[in-house]
């Protein structure tokens, strides 16, 4: 945090700039054609940062870097307690703590003042209180879970996938236990986050005396199916299409939607008619999204391409492709393989041995499955996949604990036979 004067860039920088300006009474960034007018899904994140700046009236983005640091510690604490609730095995819980803090993309994302980090923090505690409610039945835990889930969706709308995953567990519990009160919690999981989102948009519409429609969602789906040969990015990654089509159609929502629908339909028809190319496109998109171990966490910080200032050689070596950059990227790539190995072992061999914890822990599998489907269709980046992997850590820890037990028994049998 203190090794650079990094002021943020791109979406994160614009949201912070908007929070400072809005708190000062300047609403220029929500005028027709401006950033928040085009992307009203960011209004929850904007409002969260405005609230923080009300409480800490320092118009510097490092306030959020410090907040991110606290959130990383908080979400790792939540992961520890989630593991306790699921498996009640001290060794598994301790291993999950070690694995959480060994997950360095969170550390580097401290410099990423954006909804991904805030959303993951709130999601972690939403899951913790959700599990406590199912284990102990206290209404207070259900309320806290709804509050945290609402905040998670408020700052990052992609967390609708987590809402669906947790609701899936509640529906499963309803069918198994015939406790229909769980369905009330399902209703609350959808009603409160959606209401908060709607209320936020309505507030800004009333404040600015205008209807804020935003860029149609189909534009992101159309972008997610693009494969530009001249692009530096992988197939299905962000291309700037959403921004470009808005400018090209001069903000005409009907024309934007019509053009995006046409592009989407044309691309779908092409992929259906060329199955080999479709297979290459989606496999490349999947692999590039889910096998990049840094999750763009270093790239999210002070970028060499953007000439952002760094104050010493240590930070420069990390962020400007030096020796430390190579070291950390290699470490994170290897660590991702370790996580995948543990996860595969858990779902293949450990899951059936974990009793009720396995059933409750299915939220992580449903969340991961939903994330894979969503980002296969919509726009993707490797940074988007981070939450889906991080929330698997309790299961990965259980997988490695089971793997260690099997290996220990095998070695003992070998010693006896020798």
Regions found by a protein language model. Name each.
Residues 204-307:
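Membrane-proximal stem/loop segments at transmembrane-domain junctions that anchor or position
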Residues 66-87, 125, 342-346:
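Transmembrane-helix motifs of polytopic, lipid-linked glycan transferases
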Residues 29-30, 44-67, 87-90, 105, ...:
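Juxtamembrane segments of multi-pass membrane glycosylation machinery
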Residues 79-102, 357-362:
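Transmembrane-helix signature of polytopic, membrane-embedded enzymes
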Residues 141-156, 166-168, 185-193:
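Membrane-interface alpha helices of multi-pass inner-membrane proteins
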Residues 64-71, 98-125, 130, 139, ...:
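Multi-pass, polyprenyl lipid-linked donor-dependent membrane glycosyltransferases
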Residues 4-20, 24-51, 55-59, 256-260, ...:
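Extracytoplasmic catalytic/substrate-binding loops of multi-pass membrane glycan-assembly enzymes
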Residues 62-63, 68, 284-368:
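Membrane-interface anchor segments at the N-terminal boundary of transmembrane helices
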């Amino acid at each position: 945090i203190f090794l650079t004067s990094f002021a943020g860039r791109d979406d994160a920088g614009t949201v912070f700039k908007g929070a400072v300006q809005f708190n000062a009474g300047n609403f220029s960034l929500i005028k027709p054609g401006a950033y928040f007018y085009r992307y009203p899904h960011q209004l929850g994140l904007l409002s969260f940062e405005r609230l923080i700046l009300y409480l800490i009236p320092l118009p510097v983005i490092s306030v959020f870097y410090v907040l991110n640091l606290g959130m990383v510690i908080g979400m790792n604490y939540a992961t520890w307690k989630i593991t306790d609730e699921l498996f009640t095995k001290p060794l598994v819980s301790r291993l999950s703590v070690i694995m959480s803090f060994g997950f360095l993309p969170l550390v580097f994302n401290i410099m990423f003042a954006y909804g991904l980090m805030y959303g993951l923090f709130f999601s972690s505690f939403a899951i913790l209180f959700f599990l406590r409610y199912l284990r102990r039945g206290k209404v207070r835990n259900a309320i806290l879970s709804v509050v945290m889930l609402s905040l998670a969706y408020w700052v990052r709308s992609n967390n609708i996938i987590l809402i669906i995953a947790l609701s899936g567990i509640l529906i499963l519990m309803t069918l198994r236990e015939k406790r229909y009160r769980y369905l009330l919690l399902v209703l609350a999981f959808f009603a409160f986050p959606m209401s908060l989102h709607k209320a936020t948009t309505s507030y800004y519409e009333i404040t600015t005396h205008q209807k804020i429609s935003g860029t149609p969602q189909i534009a992101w789906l159309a972008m997610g199916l693009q494969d530009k040969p001249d692009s530096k990015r992988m197939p299905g990654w962000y291309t700037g299409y959403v921004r470009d089509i808005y400018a090209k159609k001069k903000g005409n929502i009907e024309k934007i939607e019509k053009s995006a629908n046409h592009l989407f339909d044309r691309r779908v028809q092409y992929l259906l008619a060329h199955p080999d190319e479709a297979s290459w496109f989606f496999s490349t998109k999947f692999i590039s999204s889910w096998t990049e171990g840094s999750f763009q966490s270093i790239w999210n910080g002070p970028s060499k391409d953007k000439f952002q200032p760094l104050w010493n050689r240590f930070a420069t070596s990390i962020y400007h492709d030096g020796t430390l950059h190579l070291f950390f990227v290699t470490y994170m790539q290897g660590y991702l393989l370790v996580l995948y190995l543990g996860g595969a072992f858990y779902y293949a061999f450990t899951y059936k041995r974990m009793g009720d914890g396995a059933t409750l822990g299915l939220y992580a599998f449903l969340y991961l499955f939903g994330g894979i489907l969503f980002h296969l269709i919509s726009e993707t980046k490797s940074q988007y996949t981070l939450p889906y992997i991080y929330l698997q850590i309790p299961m990965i820890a259980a997988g490695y604990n089971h793997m260690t037990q099997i290996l220990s028994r095998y070695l003992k049998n070998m010693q006896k036979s020798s």
